[in-house]
Amino acid sequence: MTKTMYEKIWDAHLVYEPESGSPILFVDRHLMHEVTSPQAFEGLKLQNRGVRNTHSILATMDHCVPTKGRAEISDPVAAKQIQTMAVNCKEHGINLYDMSNANNGIIHIVVPEHGFVHPGMVVCCGDSHTSTHGAFGTLAFGIGTSEVEHVMATQTLQQQKSKTLLINVEGTLSKHATAKDIALAIIGKTGTAGGTGYVIEFAGDAVVNLTMEGRMTLCNMAIEAGARAGLIAPDQKTFDFLEGKEFAPKGKDWDAALAYWKTLPSDKGADFDKVINFKAEDIAPQVTWGTSPEQVISVNGIVPAPTDFDDPIKAQACKNALEYMKIKAGQKMTDVNVDIVFLGSCTNGRIEDFRAAAEMLKGKTIAPGVQAIAVPGSYPVKEQAEAEGLDKIFLDAGWEWREPGCSMCLAMNGDELTEGQRSASTSNRNFEGRQGKNGLTHLVSPAMAAAASIAGHFVDIRDWA
């Protein structure tokens, strides 16, 4: 019987399947940060329960950490979350990369850097973008705080089995189109509910040809398509990325793991519940115009009008988004000015992203009135970028070079938009208020963000660079 990769991982981790109710899966790895863990630890304490397997957990501080140096945190709630995580991890013997640790950074960037997740694993984290780790052929779920507590106590997760959605992206990407553009183009077609009830497997030449960093970007955005998780079959790129890393298997264990990992890709002829095909050459650099990742067009496109939508709900959503974003139907995206440019986040905070942006910035200076901040996703990313001289390129162009953290992806750490400010952001969500009260967010790739900082507005980098 042929199986999809999702079915193989599911079957290997199924602990119990009741006649009614949710099946129970074994969890190999549990990732933690300071925002969704305090209540879970408190729940364990109230029930006099411990953590079942501390070696399965890796923790970091990322959401609330300041990026303008590691000064004292001014927000008392954020400071309390940071302090509480340090106390909880010390009490339970959990490996924590705190703000002073040389490995500190965003959880979904730190974890792959150390080879903590492997193909075929089930991984959980109290964070929506846990789907990032699907780039390694890992079934990775974002979970709620009560589930964080349950996983800590039992190393299991109650989970309904999802349907399977295969998204093929065949062919070769056009110049300056990236994994971020693939993700946004997919969401633009399927909508943010298109993947609801599914686990997505991304496949096709364009996906196979992505770097591991690009694959992480693509899987990171699977949740924005409504999917429970995103997966990419492990291959030689995956194995090369993991080999020699701190938590990767060694010696005979590596050989055994490698043999198992090679069995994970979906069998030829495996049956998916749904299949969607894309042509890579049709995917241009993307930019969102509205307040949802699905409200996205090619950079050379025209902002739609409510009358362009047959669905009355989407038409109303368009009307609302145009009003909030202060742009007009029929407007060219290349005529939209930006105030702030943000490079970073668990979507685009890796070394590849900083290289792409730096390539655009060489010998140029940001436009008058534009603020641009570069926030590496981890200290290892920051150190690598500085070793390559990328920090100097950013600084010479007028950008700010910050310390690692989630930063302006969400308004929780001092990095945020003020009312009415418009950003070009490499993060993953453009909801109302996501980057600050009444802030206006446009999602783009790193190269697109860098170009916008120079021009002062969005540009079609295929012609501009």
Curated annotation (Swiss-Prot):
GO terms for molecular function: 3-isopropylmalate dehydratase activity; 4 iron, 4 sulfur cluster binding; metal ion binding. Its EC number is 4.2.1.33. It holds the Pfam family Aconitase. It catalyses: (2R,3S)-3-isopropylmalate = (2S)-2-isopropylmalate. Binds 1 [4Fe-4S] cluster per subunit. Keywords: 4Fe-4S, Amino-acid biosynthesis, Branched-chain amino acid biosynthesis, Iron, Iron-sulfur, Leucine biosynthesis, Lyase, Metal-binding. [4Fe-4S] cluster binds at residues 346, 406, 409. GO terms for biological process: L-leucine biosynthetic process. Its cofactor is [4Fe-4S] cluster. Belongs to the aconitase/IPM isomerase family. LeuC type 1 subfamily. PANTHER family: 3-ISOPROPYLMALATE DEHYDRATASE, HOMOACONITASE, MITOCHONDRIAL-RELATED. Catalyzes the isomerization between 2-isopropylmalate and 3-isopropylmalate, via the formation of 2-isopropylmaleate. HAMAP family: LeuC_type1. Heterodimer of LeuC and LeuD. This is 3-isopropylmalate dehydratase large subunit. The gene is leuC.
